[in-house]
Design a protein with these regions (language model features):
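An N-terminal hydrophobic leader/cap segment in hydrolases
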Residues: 17-72
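A short loop-to-beta-strand scaffold at the N-terminal edge of the catalytic core in hydrolase folds
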Residues: 77-87
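The serine-hydrolase catalytic nucleophile loop
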Residues: 102-115
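Conserved alpha/beta-hydrolase
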Residues: 117-134
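Alpha/beta-hydrolase fold nucleophile elbow
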Residues: 163-171
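Conserved small/polar residues in nucleotide/adenosyl-binding loops
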Residues: 172-177
């Protein structure tokens, strides 16, 4: 009788552990691999143009002048990272690194880029964090690796705009870095 009880208890514990592990894995994947609108570049541009109509003419003028540029870096773990950058209309040391939030991409921060670049006269750099936009990676991060990536992007901004930059770093949400 005692042997049957132990076997039954063991089976119940193994099943319970399997259920808990399965549920934990499901929740982890759900939170770290949500519907990633950050990969939909065309949809992101369309959303921005619909929401902020002035961005269309600004983007078109930047592209016609060759001022909206792309750059790529590699993170220490060999993930290829992307950013857009635009120099200010007049030479300046003022630079803004503008970082998007969870499941977004650099495109969805262009309204802030517009303000800093066109209205405040800053150089701007807008990175795509891991697994968003044109950046590599197999999962969106929640800040742990992003913090180092943002520092690397700030160093890249110094390389692009000069070592004497006066920099502001805008993080859209707390999980950005």
């Amino acid at each position: 009788m005692k042997k049957k009880y132990l076997i039954g208890t063991g089976i119940v514990l193994v099943l319970l552990a399997a259920i808990l592990l399965g549920a934990g894995q499901y929740m982890l994947n759900y939170s770290l691999r949500p519907d990633n609108r950050g990969r939909d570049l065309a949809g992101s541009w369309q959303y921005m143009f619909d929401t902020y109509p002035y961005l269309k003419s600004w983007k078109d003028s930047l592209q016609n002048a060759g001022a909206l540029k792309d750059t790529f870096i590699y993170a220490p773990d060999d993930v290829k990272m992307h950013a857009y950058y635009v120099a200010a209309a007049q030479p300046t040391a003022k630079t803004a690194v503008i970082v998007h939030g969870y499941t977004d991409n650099a495109i969805r921060m262009m309204m802030i880029g517009y303000m800093y670049n066109k209205e405040l006269g800053f150089n701007i750099l807008l990175p795509d964090l891991r697994d968003t936009g044109l950046s590599g990676g197999d999962a969106i991060q929640m800040g742990w690796l992003d913090r180092k990536d943002v520092i690397q992007w700030m160093n890249t901004a110094n390389e692009i705009y000069g070592d004497s930059t006066r920099m502001v770093c805008l993080l859209y949400t707390s999980d950005a870095a």
